């Protein structure tokens, strides 16, 4: 067992970083326009793969070498998707929520919660929807190197999910928020402090153990120095907590980038990508 216990130390020693979140949209140009003009993101790169009948666009608030970005996927001929009940929201921090909300409104976006203090807290927030119906929480904060600050997913067992992301992915529980009066609990997971980088926000709603996944949200990609060793750790944690490997560690055909992909116990997908291969892709 010494080997397994040594292996389980690896995720904490590894050089991990959130790279991007992948999801599907019905009109790539429409979403690019909305994210650049409304949210102030930059279009970082775009690729069209006609033989596979899809296009990708990468957008973010800084370069992919340092920032967390979105990877939008457009599948030819598919104009809408089912977001499901499990996906929660993305979050963007801004120094002026009201101004950003006005910009959303001016560009035809849907404001679902007007700016105001968060329930039971002091932060000023708002909620808006993009053209595909993905929810974005807008949070008023001071300047930050990473304005794209959260991905929120709902889980059926928060303690199990926290344990999975700690053991399988080497994340830290940055903060736990209990809200019994609103019947939910949140765990903020990440690799760095919450106000400096992206966090994974796991939400447990009392008595809700299952959600629909839909076909819109795809996965989060995280960098690693060794996909093979990381894959072995995932297998050990899968046996203990649930989840499964969906693609064994190894190079992707055509690209050569080494990855391993897996589902967590709630069925959310993560892809670990070799750090050096990822940087090569950006050259």
From Swiss-Prot:
Substrate binds at residues 24, 75, 89, 150, 154, 205, 251-252. Zn(2+) binds at residues 20, 71, 89, 137, 150, 201. One of its GO terms (molecular function) is dioxygenase activity. GO terms for biological process: methylglyoxal catabolic process to D-lactate via S-lactoyl-glutathione. Keywords: Acetylation, Dioxygenase, Lyase, Manganese, Metal-binding, Oxidoreductase, Phosphoprotein, Repeat, Zinc. Its cofactor is Zn(2+). Belongs to the glyoxalase I family. This is Lactoylglutathione lyase GLX1. The lineage of its organism: Eukaryota, Viridiplantae, Streptophyta, Embryophyta, Tracheophyta.
């Amino acid at each position: 067992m010494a080997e397994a216990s040594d292996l389980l130390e690896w995720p904490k020693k590894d050089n991990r970083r959130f790279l991007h979140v992948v999801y599907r949209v019905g009109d790539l140009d429409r979403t690019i326009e909305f994210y650049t003009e409304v949210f102030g993101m930059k279009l970082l790169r775009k690729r069209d793969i006609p033989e596979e009948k899809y296009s990708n666009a990468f957008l973010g608030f800084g370069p992919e070498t340092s920032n967390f970005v979105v990877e939008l996927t457009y599948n030819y001929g598919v104009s809408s998707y089912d977001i499901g009940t499990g996906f929660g929201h993305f979050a963007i921090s801004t120094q002026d929520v009201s101004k950003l909300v006005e910009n959303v409104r001016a560009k035809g976006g849907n404001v679902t919660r007007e700016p105001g203090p968060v329930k039971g807290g002091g932060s000023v927030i708002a909620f808006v929807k993009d053209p595909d119906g993905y929810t974005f929480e807008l949070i008023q904060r001071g300047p930050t190197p990473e304005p794209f600050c959260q991905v929120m997913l709902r889980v059926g067992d928060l303690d199990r999910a926290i344990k999975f992301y700690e053991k399988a992915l080497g994340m830290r529980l940055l903060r736990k928020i209990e809200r019994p009066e609103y019947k939910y609990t949140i765990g903020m997971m990440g690799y760095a402090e919450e106000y400096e980088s992206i966090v994974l926000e796991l939400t447990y709603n009392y008595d809700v153990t299952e959600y629909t996944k839909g076909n819109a949200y795809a996965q989060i990609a995280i960098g690693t120095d060794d996909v093979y060793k990381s894959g072995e750790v995932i297998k050990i944690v899968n046996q203990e907590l649930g989840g499964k490997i969906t693609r064994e560690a190894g190079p992707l055909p055509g690209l050569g980038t080494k990855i391993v992909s897996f589902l967590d116990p709630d069925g959310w997908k993560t892809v670990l990508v070799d750090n050096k291969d990822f940087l090569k892709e950006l050259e």
